[in-house]
A protein has these predicted regions:
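Flexible "arm" and connector segments at domain edges
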Residues: 1-105
């Protein structure tokens, strides 16, 4: 099994457990796929534990995904708020199945 790990993990493992095998990913497409897997892992950890600190891991992975995709997350975030709004009003929609696609950007 392999998965993306943070930069300092090999050193931390070597200090406590001994050997840590790892490799550096050079291929951007593979790195992007590993980041997507990591995002799923981190979201599942948050959903399982409900720990707010897990959100930091999610945000970190999202930041790296945006970097690889060469997109400005802040710009996209602000654009999405302008076009679709936020969640300030705490609205809940009731839709027949299947749910409508609304401004999917």
């Amino acid at each position: 099994m392999y998965k993306l790990i943070r930069d300092l993990i090999p050193e931390l493992i070597q200090q406590t457990e001994g050997i840590c095998n790892y490799a550096e990913v050079k291929n951007d497409e593979f790195y992007y796929a590993l980041l997507q897997d990591k995002l799923i892992e981190e979201v599942n950890e948050y959903l399982a534990t409900g720990e707010i600190t897990e959100l930091v891991d999610i945000i970190t992975v999202i930041k790296y995904i945006a970097d690889v995709a060469k997109v400005d997350l802040k710009e996209l975030y602000e654009e999405k708020l302008k076009t679709n709004g936020g969640f300030d009003k705490r609205l809940v929609g009731f839709f027949p199945d299947p749910q409508p696609e609304v401004n999917q950007k």
